[in-house]
Amino acid sequence: MDSFEDKLQQLREAFNAGRTRSAEFRAAQLQGLSHFLRDNKQQLQEALAQDLHKSAFESEVSEIAISQAEVDLALRNLRSWMKDEKVSKNLATQLDSAFIRKEPFGLVLIIVPWNYPLNLTLVPLVGAIAAGNCVVLKPSEISKATEKILAEVLPRYLDQSCFAVVLGGPQETGQLLEHRFDYIFFTGNTYVGKIVMAAAAKHLTPITLELGGKNPCYVDDNCDPQTVANRVAWFRYFNAGQTCVAPDYVLCSQEMQERLVPALQNAITRFYGDNPQTSPNLGRIINQKHFERLQGLLGCGRVAIGGQSDEGERYIAPTVLVDVQETEPVMQEEIFGPILPLVTVTNLDEAIEFINRREKPLALYAFSKRSQVIKQVLARTSSGGFCGNDGFMHMTLSSLPFGGVGTSGMGRYHGKFSFDTFSNQRACLLRSPGMEKINDLRYPPYTSRNLRVLLVAMEKRCCSCTLL
């Protein structure tokens, strides 16, 4: 028996009845999300600490505050986002009404990963709600403590005839994907992304895929090594490196590597102390499977910093690898952990060639005191996002779209981009039932004169007297 059938039917009936369409309903659900975040802040922080050993600081910055900001932005702008968008007209339609209507798709499925289990649930959910959809949330079964709150507490703040949280692992997710949805939003790795896309293709369901990849970080010789080290170490080891936009490797000259390694050691010691394992600010690996995978990568190249691990705590020290070969496993897969390989190149051209012969990344970073170098990297490469002289701060701007390209994903969200993602852009033209004399120009029998007049009328963007 299909355990999802009844619930999905209930949600679809609610959507078809128009329950989610009004601005008032959407605003009420968004306010519910806001109350959920404020009422359960401590409980959420405790769950994130239990799942990932996240500090209260990292939980606030990367999970709670970002989610709250998205809710607040949607509430402030909901009515303006929902308004019909007027468009330009040609001469033939000057007296008509032409506009784009942003209508909800219908029943949306959001599949969430474990690394930012609150952020990556609520941020797309805000967009889906604001756009007027009914939603099925599938949180990750791996981040168990956060999953429990999302399943047991979040529904109390939403209209349960329009929103549902479903639980389970890969088998249940596979069963869920057999059903027809009107939109699917998936965040996770490329392998599973292909499975989700294949399932969506059976029903021709539109989809957003937020995937990952190996994000490059180029460091120019003219940089201050300590400034670069501070910034790179922070966003590499944030959440124990389990971040889809974290730098996966650094490209720099041999000279810069020799300056960067001690600077990275200084930054790591400053951030996490002489024994990072005792630091309350360093996360842990999510589970045993990923811990063992990361341990295997520690054998690549040569360990310049860190390399220690503790299986009992699923702890891996902030690690820097040097003398890494491009063919080694650490350079063939997304690391998704607190390991940073340094790869030496002779110049900027070689670095760009190295980047371009790999799959397009979700994010790309470049450090230089020369703006021309930053502009060259930006102009000669492709990635989902780009940040010069820092890391993943572009993620904090709701005015910038977030998403991948190629194997790092498709589709965009954050801020109004989330609303647009979950909205069908419906092209609308409302014409007069009268004035049939003018329309006679387009009817048979066709003449060359009528063709000339009609072509002018269809091309002109404003009124014109030159009709003949």
From Swiss-Prot:
Lipidated sites in chain (S-palmitoyl cysteine): 462-463
GO cellular component: cytoplasm; cytosol; plasma membrane
Active-site residues, record numbering mapped to chain: 210, 244
Sites bearing Cysteine methyl ester, chain numbering: 465
UniProt feature coiled coil, ranges: none
Membrane topology: Lipid-anchor
EC number(s) on file: 1.2.1.28, 1.2.1.5, 1.2.1.7, 1.2.1.48
Main subcellular localisation: membrane
Modified residues (N-acetylmethionine): 1
SUPFAM superfamilies per record: ALDH-like
Protein modification: Dually lipidated in the C-terminus; prenylation occurs prior to, and is a prerequisite for palmitoylation. It is also required for activity towards long-chain substrates.
Molecular-function annotations in GO: 3-chloroallyl aldehyde dehydrogenase activity; aldehyde dehydrogenase (NAD+) activity; aldehyde dehydrogenase [NAD(P)+] activity; benzaldehyde dehydrogenase (NAD+) activity; benzaldehyde dehydrogenase (NADP+) activity; long-chain fatty aldehyde dehydrogenase (NAD+) activity; medium-chain fatty aldehyde dehydrogenase (NAD+) activity
Alphabetical UniProt keywords: Acetylation, Cell membrane, Lipid metabolism, Lipoprotein, Membrane, Methylation, NAD, Oxidoreductase, Palmitate, Prenylation
Protein name: Aldehyde dehydrogenase family 3 member B1
Organism lineage: Eukaryota, Metazoa, Chordata, Craniata, Vertebrata
